[in-house]
Amino acid sequence: MFKCVGMRDVTRTLIRDWNACDLMNKRCIVHYRGRVQGVGFRFTAVRQSKGLSVHGYVKNESDGSVLMDVEGGTADVAELLRRIEMEMSGNIDSINLDERQPQNRDGGLVIRY
């Protein structure tokens, strides 16, 4: 599990630890904390996933955080995290990222209620 105080730390860690040319699927459970509910965070995540081969869901949690369960190729998952960082960094106070076994899902990234 990675515990970071900002997306830049997570993105750098992923790029360092994952081979960006690795064609294997990666799956991450990401908890975003901060001012992440009521600001379009989930919709931004889905919009930023367009054009990437990533699958999973993003949803609000009862504790005020947002959970994203995403999987796809290494480069696409890292790119999605980077895109979210670029647009939402002012809202993110901290994140927890836990790498999991891929489930080979399809259907893109969707909002789960």
Give the ranges of each region predicted by the language model.
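Intrinsically disordered, low-complexity, mixed-charge
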Residues: F2-Y113
